């Protein structure tokens, strides 16, 4: 079974979600920012791939009510939060969603990351989102712990083995997260 089949199977095993909060590593802002688009457009925020990839769309719907609940939850833990009225879904959001929910039947609320916010802010954001999971929200974090396409392509096209840092970093990270 390939990874896309595993993702689809896992999605089918989840209970029906009221809305999906998708946190993509490809939307990085200073403050947590919540997308409010009624029909978030599919963003093709990449280059150098086969033309067919640029034709793919994910016809998601948004939910202003769900987005407002996310804003309220973030405010409740003392974090400032921004609203993005027209934010679309970047490839870190729509690609996994397209595999998990191909019919786009569940409303989607995009949420940005803050790569310079530090661990305390990330922890607070997690505290804000946790109660929403108990209210029918599915919270999905998307992205790899390493993302160097140059090294990946070099290895994939016969240019050598996967670099050691790519093989070692996930274990290093897991050890620290579980400590």
Q: Where are the language model's segments positioned?
A:
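N-terminal low-complexity or amphipathic/hydrophobic leaders
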Residues: 14-31
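Short beta-strand segments
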Residues: 21-25, 112-114, 140-142
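A short, N-terminal amphipathic alpha-helix
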Residues: 6-16
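Internal, conserved structured core segments that host functional sites
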Residues: 67-123, 128
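Surface-exposed, charge/polar-rich loops and edge strands
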Residues: 69, 76, 106-107, 115-117, ...
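A charged helix-plus-loop insertion that forms the helical arch/lid used to bind
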Residues: 35-59
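Short, small-residue-biased leader/transition segments that mark boundaries at the very start
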Residues: 1-3
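Flexible, glycine/proline-enriched loop segments at strand-loop-helix junctions
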Residues: 53-61, 84, 112-119, 160
